Structure formats: C-alpha cells, structure tokens
Amino acid sequence: MRRDIAGIVLAGGQSRRMGGGDKSLLPLGSGSVLDQILSRFGPQIEILALSANGDPERFSRFGLPVLADTVEGFAGPLAGILTGLEWAIAGTPCKAVVTAAGDTPFLPLDLVDRLAAAARDHPGSIAVASSAGRRHPTFALWPTECRDALRHFLVDEDNRRVSDFIERHGHVEVEFRFVQSAGLDPFFNINVPDDLAQAARLLQSMTS
C-alpha cells in the first residue's frame, strides 16, 4: 500500500442517461459502483478522498473526505483533479495524486504502482493509463508540482479538457492489458443502463 501518493476518486459524475444522481452510487453487486471501485483502489493507497460537489452526506458511509471543487462553475473532472492536488499539498505529505473515475468498477489492481513506476522514470511528467491504444486521462498520476499550471489552464484559460492539459504538460502513457479471462477492458465505464447490467454480469462471473 502506497503512503507517498494520495488517491482521488472522481465520484461526482452525473447519470443523466440513467435517471439522474451520481453514477458512483448506482447499485452494483451487494453494494454500489463506488464500493466496487474502493475494493480495488483502496488497498493500493493509504490516503484517499472523494471528489464530488453537492451534499457530502450522501457519501458519509464510506468514511472518506469529500472534496468540493475549489473552482466555481462545475468545471468537470479537471476541477476535481485540481482540488485533489490542492488537498494533497495542504494536508498530506504526498508529492503526487492518482485519480480514478467514479464510474469504472474494474480498474486495475496494480494501477498505482505502475503509474508510479512510469512517473519515477519520467520526473515531473503526468503518467496516464491507456488500454487497447486508447488513453484514459482521468486515470493518471499527477505530480503536485503541476498544480499552479493546472489552475492557470482551468481558470485563466478556461480550458476544461483533461487531455489538452496532459498534452501540454508532458506525459508518459502506461498500457494496461485486458483481463484475458473475461475479455474485460479494466477501464470499462458505466454510461447507460446496458453498461450497468453488463457490469453486474461481469462482477458475478468474477466472484463466482
């Protein structure tokens, strides 16, 4: 378990195509999507928080800090990443933050270690996950030293595209393979009801 890197779950994504509310709180298996994410992400990292706006009480049973955006206007995942960096700088000894999307229940069990290894070989760079040739910009290791540049990018330039900032800052990609036994992309995410049903089937097959 890493103690030198903080983890942030970007948990405030809305399920507009699924009736509203937080995608991370949708039911999955015996718990929620977020329960499943934390069962895989939590053992990798000691210092962990949730990024979400609105009433933090809806996440109270998880026992984790809930970080509201420090940038106004619901500026998307990049605002959550910035807030996570600011929280890590102000309240932890960590020099980097690993983020994970709150709608991706099968994230890799070695996500943090592999991103950290890549970042160690490329000091100052953002280490970002990819699979099958596709980059997953919300699954990345962000050095705390990029905080000021990120705030300028988001606030002063009003650019909310995560990939644009990654390209500008400098990055290294880390390829994660599909889970061969299930043919599963570890970054499979839930956007529509069919995705949630598929996630339930996959989870059942993995635990049976």
Curated annotation (Swiss-Prot):
GTP binds at L10, A11, G12, K23, D69, D103. The gene is mobA. One of its GO terms (biological process) is bis(molybdopterin guanine dinucleotide)molybdenum biosynthetic process. It catalyses: Mo-molybdopterin + GTP + H(+) = Mo-molybdopterin guanine dinucleotide + diphosphate. Signal peptide: none annotated. Coiled coil: none annotated. PANTHER family: MOLYBDENUM COFACTOR GUANYLYLTRANSFERASE (PTHR19136:SF81). Belongs to the MobA family. This is Molybdenum cofactor guanylyltransferase. HAMAP family: MobA. The keyword Chaperone does not apply. It holds the Pfam family NTP_transf_3. The N-terminal domain determines nucleotide recognition and specific binding, while the C-terminal domain determines the specific binding to the target protein. Its EC number is 2.7.7.77. It comes from the Bacteria. Monomer. It is an enzyme of class 2 (transferase). It is found in: Cytoplasm. SUPFAM superfamilies: Nucleotide-diphospho-sugar transferases (SSF53448). One of its GO terms (molecular function) is metal ion binding. Transfers a GMP moiety from GTP to Mo-molybdopterin (Mo-MPT) cofactor (Moco or molybdenum cofactor) to form Mo-molybdopterin guanine dinucleotide (Mo-MGD) cofactor. Mg(2+) binds at D103. Its main location: cytoplasm. Gene3D superfamilies: Spore Coat Polysaccharide Biosynthesis Protein SpsA, Chain A. Keywords: Cytoplasm, GTP-binding, Magnesium, Metal-binding, Molybdenum cofactor biosynthesis, Nucleotide-binding, Transferase. One of its GO terms (cellular component) is cytoplasm.
